Structures are given as C-alpha cells and as structure tokens.
Amino acid sequence: NEDGEVKKADMFYKQTIKAKTVIDRVETAVEALNVSVNEFGYVNLAYMLSIYEPDITNAKEELAEKSGQTVDEITLSDDALAELRRAVLVEELDGLIFLNPDRYNENNPDIGWETADEYLSGNVRDKLRVAKAMAADTGNPQAEKFAGNVAALEKVQPEWIEASDIDVKIGTTWIEPLDYEQFIYELLNTPRRARAVRSQFYNTGIQVHLNKMSMEWFIENKSMDKHSVAATKTYGTSRMDAYSIFEDTLNLKTVTVRDRIDDGDGKYHYEVNKNETMLAREKQNMIKEKFKEWLFSEPERRQKYVEYYNETFNNIRLREYDGSHLQFPGMNPAIELKPHQKNAVARILLGGNTLLAHCVGAGKSFEMMAACMEQKRLGLANKTIMVVPKPLIGQTASEFLRLYPSANILVATERDFEKSRRKQFVSRIATGDYDCIIMSHSQFEKIPISAERKERMLNEQIDEISYAIDEMKERNGERWTVKQMESQKKKLEEQLKSLSDESRKDDLITFEELGVDSIMVDEAHNFKNLAIFSKMNNVSGISSSGAKKSTDMQLKCQYLSEINDGRGIVFATGTPISNTMCEMYVMQLYLQKAALEEMGIYHFDSWAANFGEVTTALELTVEGSGFRFKSRFNKFTNLPELMNIFREVADVQTADMLNLPVPQAEYINEVLKPSETQEEMVSSFADRAEAVRNGNVNPRFDNMLKITNDGRKLALDQRLINPLLPDFEDSKLNACVDAMFETWERGSEKRLTQLFFCDL
C-alpha cells in the first residue's frame, strides 16, 4: 500500500476468478439450446446433439409404419441416424428456433437456425416476404418448414398505420417529383401552356426535379406562371411568388424576404424585410396545409404512399434481449452484474452495433468490459480497443482487472504516444493477442485511417457531384446551383491532391492494419460534433462544421461496419441527445448507416424531412433588448417509427427505469435586481448586436459569441467586465457567497462539505 506495507492478495484467501463450467450432458432440448447460445452465441445444432440425446423412439416407429417393418427390423446408416436425431431435436424446439431463408444452406442442414427472439424481430415485413416466397417453392424440401415461419411472422407484424397518423411534409424525398408537380398545378391552377411536356426531343414547362447527389429540389421554368393571381396574391406575394415559396419549402427552408440597402461607394448589404417576410411565411404555411389535405385525398395516391410508409418505416419489431443465461467465465465471482447489465451484454453479443444510452451509475463500464471478454471467448471479435476519456484510463484499467483478474489488457500511457514511442506501441497492438487495448480519445485519433480509404471516399464524392453537375447542365439548371456544386467539387479535388502529396505521419501502421475488429467508446457524446450538410441555412441546431476527431471516428466506424456486417461498434453515454435533435441522426450515422440507406435516407435532409420539423418563433435576442424571429430544428414528427428505428441499436436505461438510489434535489432560483451600471451595459449590448447583424463590424473584434459571453460575465459580477467598477452589494457573486456562508454555518458542527460549481 502507500505506506509500504505488504500483504497477501485476495487470491490467497478467496476465489477471484469464476471457473468455466464445462457442460457435457443436459436433459432437455431447451437446456441444450440455452447452453449453445451461452457457449457460441448462436444455435449450434451439432454441439447441441453432442450434449443432448433426443428420444427417437416415436420417429423410428413412424418409419417402421411407413415401410411395413417392425422397429427392430429398421437399420439406419450413421448419416441417416444423425439426420433423424437432428429432425427430432428441431421438432422438440418447434416455435423456439426457426430456419432463416436468407442463411439457409441446403448442403449443410446445421446452418441458418436462429432463436425465435432473433428471427421474429428486426425488419419482419421483409422477412415475411422472403418466407412466403420460400414456402411457395414446392421444389424446396424445407417449404413446409418455411410455411411455419410465415405463420409465426404474420403474428408479429407491426400494426398498420393509416394515412391520418402519417405526417408527410413538403420536401419528403420519397414523394415522387411528378406528384409534387401535380399538387402545385392543381393548387395554382397552372395554365396548360406552362405545364410540363416531356419527350425524347425536348422538355419544357414548369417541372419539379430532385438532385440525387445534393438531395436539393428545384423547380425548372417557374417564371412561366409567376405573375398569376394565385402565384402572387392567393398563395404568394408581390415580392415572392408561390412557385419560389414552394421551392424553398421543398428544400425545408423558412422563406425570408430581404431588401438591398446601398451603403454608397458601390457597396451594399441586405436586411430582412420583416413585414414582407411575415406575409410570405403566412403563404408558406397555407401551402403546407393545402399539401397535407391534398396528398391523401385521392384513393390511389393514398394507398401508394401509405403502403410505402408502412413497408419502409413501420417494418420493425424490437428484440427483447435476455442475458440471464450468460455465465461469464473468468469474471470475479464477488461481482454480480445486475439484470439490465446482463441484458445489455446480450444485446452487444447477439445484436449488431450498440448504443448504451444508460444514465450515470447504471454500470456502463462493466457492461462493455464483460461484453469485450465474452465476444473474445465466443469468437465474435478478435481484438477490441476501448476508447475512454484521458482522465479515466487508469481507473478503467484497474476496474477491468477487478472484474476480470486474469484479463490480458494493454493500457496506453502518455509516454506510449510520444512521437518517438508511438510507432512501437502501435506495433504492439498489431502483433499482440490482447483481450482489450485501452486508450484515450486523443490517442485513438492519432492512429491514422489509411490514405487509400480517404482517397476512395473523396473520389466517390467527386464522382457523385460530377454526375449531378452534368445532370443539372443537361436540364439547364439554375446557374447558382451549378456554380455551388462546382465550387464544392473543386474543394474535394484540392483535398484529394493534398492527401496524395502528404506523406504518412510517423509512417504509422494504419487502423485497418491493426487487426482491430471491435471498438468500445466510453463518453461517446464527445464525438457528436460531426459535420452535417444541409440545404437548410440559418437554422439553429444544424451545424455544417465538425470536429476532426468526429470525422476520424466516422471513417473508422464505417470500416468496422463493412468488415463485420453491421456489428463491432459499441458507444456508451449518459447523454446521447443533449443539445439538438441532429445528435440522434449523428448517432444513427455512426451505428446504423446501412439501415438508414435501406430506407432511402442517404442525407440529413431526407432524415429531417421524415422525422423533424423547423419551427419559427419570436425569441428574446442575444443581448436581451428585444425579440426577433428565430428558426430552430426542434420538433420531432413520426416519432414512434423513428424511435423503433433508433431502438434497434439503442439500449436505453434511465434512472427511473433502474430505480437508482438518487436523493431528491432542491432547486432554488435567486432573483436579483441589476445595478444601474449593469442596465446601461445591457443597453450597449443591443447596439453591438445590431452592428454585428448588419455586418458593420469585423468579426475578429466583435461577434455574437463575444456579446453572449460578456453578458454572462456581466450577470455574474460587473467587475468581470471592468475590474475598476465598484463591488455591487447585490451581485450574483455576493449572493452566492452569502448563501454558501449560511450553509457552512448550519453544517459547521457536523463538519459538512459543500460543492460549488461555476460555469465561467
């Protein structure tokens, strides 16, 4: 210990490692199934038959009856006997295991079996389609077995959602462009001369198009009917016609009308025309409401889109994971995981990528450690890196060895990632056989993803954008859109050239060369700052700038999902969604990108059109001097379906669900009056903010962030703005000191302790 005293370790007095129990015989088929799942993580018929002897008496009697022989006269070859034993075992487990048609192999009858909770979950609509096709194949020897699948799957289909419960907004990408065209024609009574004409010789008329690369909608030739009464008065304004409003709405934008203000000397700036903007937004809301009424009004169109929505988004049955059968050989027997922890481990082992969205104190660290050891034992993962915040490396390592005393772990120290030692340490990861490698977030980022993977990603983006540019030019798309895409293409090409010219730093082994096939990321919310590219601009909650470490994490997650078919990634955080709705999309992008793409969601705007909504409301200005309109992406739509998709990867456990022993907090809000100096300074903030909005000040000298920060400092104590100002007796700081002193006096007899937090 710290005093230099030596004593015998716990292993001298008690068992510190749970021995592995070897089971060589069970009495029932169900027991054999449980042991198989515990030992291998799946239904292993060959293993089950090695520990369980099914009673084949009745089966032999049926054979005798069919052949006209007695039971004693029947002789079976070894292969025939093995097949009979397998058939009896499968029959005994009828309803508990199913043969998955997607994994079925007619040459190996042991392959493709799944437990009921696995097979009867996930995309059950797609599974039902496949099962029906296989059951209808009369030439398939397993057709009867697949008919049983059909019956079981039909019982677990999600309840059909009717049109009245589906929220479809303008801009939803699975609504066909021709239907958007038809809507605007009917709404504005577009004259026939201005309607679309498509032929192999020419295209003309007002047409709605979707750029598949940028997912940007544009209306071609909208000027052909921009002066009609419907376009300029009923559903539009003199400053913004209905076609332009509809185009902005398709692109999820809140319409804004701006006036050009001349500053002299050939300079000018734009200011929002509040009255015209309010009028245009009123027309925009009218168009939105009319679209909702129109979309499902025609029976054939209603059936088409209701079926699409149910087949695409309402197709999931969530799986209930039960970890009660797990034995955890090698774990410290003095530690017993709680039921929710065992279930979380089962989810990681039996499911795919996982988000442990558990509250503080739920035991996420032990869940990841146990899952790490179990997936190594079961052969589900060969090498796992556990990524934790830098201050927690030592604690994580000691907790790991407390849970698994004989674990072979490699722990990265600060010295290991110094430039002179980094290559040696990374080589140890590549060449060693470790149960787990523990390192910090920043150290993980220093292990490079291969230049080839980065180049491939950039080339794919360049190819996509080149195709989109060609498509736009063929359709005579708007020049600003083409120019914008060409600028984006140029930036990508510069990145590609920079990547080609850059020599690999330290000549390190790349992430792909390490042999790592699993990562577990603690405090994963630190990687939520991933760049989101969206057509929506000036909308709070959407950021197009991202952190480098988040991009690095995304590339590594994509690699692991590719080699593991959607597994191998575990994120753990108590705050998966804390600031904006976009954080849910980011988590889905890390963990279930392929699932989103199966639904046709390749971009954030597609996700936002299905599951979110931008709201505009009056809000107090940053400087607190008045109100202004603010657009925020802050409202969920079609939430039940979104949560079903999200819960496929997310294991959510709140403090209320776990009934954790957390004491009730008493919140006290102190209301204080400002000093005269503070009031004067708040007024000056309004002038500063107006100057920033109008672009009259260099952002290096003043900006909204600086004004906000000055406001926070002023609210705490005016001397934080100017140390020469007097100490205001009723300041927040003084009120806090008085409260702390009063609390200290009350607890001085018992020598109680206070914790004080200040976010400045």
Where are these regions (language model features)?
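Conserved SF1/SF2 helicase motif Ia
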Residues: 360-362, 367-398, 404-408, 563-568
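Conserved pre-motif I regulatory segment
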Residues: 315-357
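Inter-lobe coupling linker of SF2 helicases/translocases
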Residues: 422-469, 474-476, 480, 487-518, ...
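Hydrophobic anchor at the beta1->P-loop junction of P-loop NTPases
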Residues: 356, 386, 572
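Charged, low-complexity intrinsically disordered regions
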Residues: 1-315, 381, 405, 429, ...
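Walker B catalytic acidic pair
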Residues: 522-523
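Conserved helix-turn-beta segment of the N-terminal RecA-like "Helicase ATP-binding" lobe
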Residues: 391-418, 424, 428-431, 591-595
